[in-house]
């Protein structure tokens, strides 16, 4: 196997250009999630692919949230959220939650249940992680929210929605 030469970033080279970084990150396939919250500060939701497991003891995941997002002040003030991982047929819902659509219209487009934290659980999601935000860190334009998982709701699903190459793709388990 022959590897293509890559540009490196170090104290001796030019910094990585933002567009090059974004193009490279587009090659990283990721599950598509709708992050939801409900509480004293209101109800909000947004689409995210920057979600991953941190540890299973205690069960913790992280969610990256742009501080300029309309959902940011609501999510952080509520201190709780639900990560709803989408099935292949839910790409339209992903687009709705990823745009500028008013929150009430986003939530009206699907059926929801309520988790132990009070956050909305998406009916038909492949899995929902109901979480309490335990702490956060700010990096660049985003906050990294570390979330302790309080409950997991799994559904029988044979496919998932992933984002790769700036496009949605259905991923089947077969």
UniProtKB/Swiss-Prot annotation:
Assigned EC number: 1.5.1.42
Catalytic activity: FMNH2 + NAD(+) = FMN + NADH + 2 H(+)
Enzyme type, top EC level: oxidoreductase
Keywords: Flavoprotein, FMN, NAD, Oxidoreductase
Pfam families tied to this protein: Flavin_Reduct
Tagged with keyword Cell inner membrane: no
An example Gene Ontology molecular-function term: riboflavin reductase (NADPH) activity
Record InterPro entries: Flavin_Rdtase-like_dom (IPR002563), NADH-dep_flavin_reductase (IPR050268), RutF (IPR019917), Split_barrel_FMN-bd (IPR012349)
A single GO BP: nitrogen utilization
Gene3D superfamilies per UniProt: Electron Transport, Fmn-binding Protein, Chain A (2.30.110.10)
Superkingdom to which the source organism belongs: Bacteria
Family matches, as PANTHER family: FLAVIN REDUCTASE, FMN REDUCTASE (NADH) RUTF
Function: Catalyzes the reduction of FMN to FMNH2 which is used to reduce pyrimidine by RutA via the Rut pathway.
Recorded family membership: Belongs to the non-flavoprotein flavin reductase family. RutF subfamily.
Designated name of the protein: FMN reductase (NADH) RutF
Annotated source species: Stutzerimonas stutzeri (strain A1501)
């Amino acid at each position: 196997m022959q590897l293509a030469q890559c540009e490196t970033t170090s104290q001796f080279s030019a910094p990585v250009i933002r567009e090059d970084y974004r193009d490279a990150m587009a090659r990283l396939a990721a599950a598509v999630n709708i992050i939801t919250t409900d509480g004293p500060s209101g109800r909000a939701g947004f689409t995210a692919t920057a979600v991953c497991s941190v540890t299973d003891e205690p069960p913790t995941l992280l969610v990256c949230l742009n501080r300029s997002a309309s959902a940011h002040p609501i999510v952080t003030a509520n201190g709780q959220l639900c990560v709803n991982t989408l099935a292949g047929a839910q790409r339209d819902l992903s687009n709705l939650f990823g745009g500028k659509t008013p929150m009430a219209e986003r939530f009206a487009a699907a059926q929801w249940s309520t988790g132990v934290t009070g956050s909305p659980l998406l009916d038909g999601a492949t899995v929902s992680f109901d979480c309490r935000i335990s702490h956060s860190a700010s990096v660049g334009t985003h906050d990294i929210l570390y979330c302790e998982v309080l409950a997991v709701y799994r559904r029988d699903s044979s496919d998932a929605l992933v984002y790769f190459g700036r496009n949605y793709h259905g991923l089947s388990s077969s």
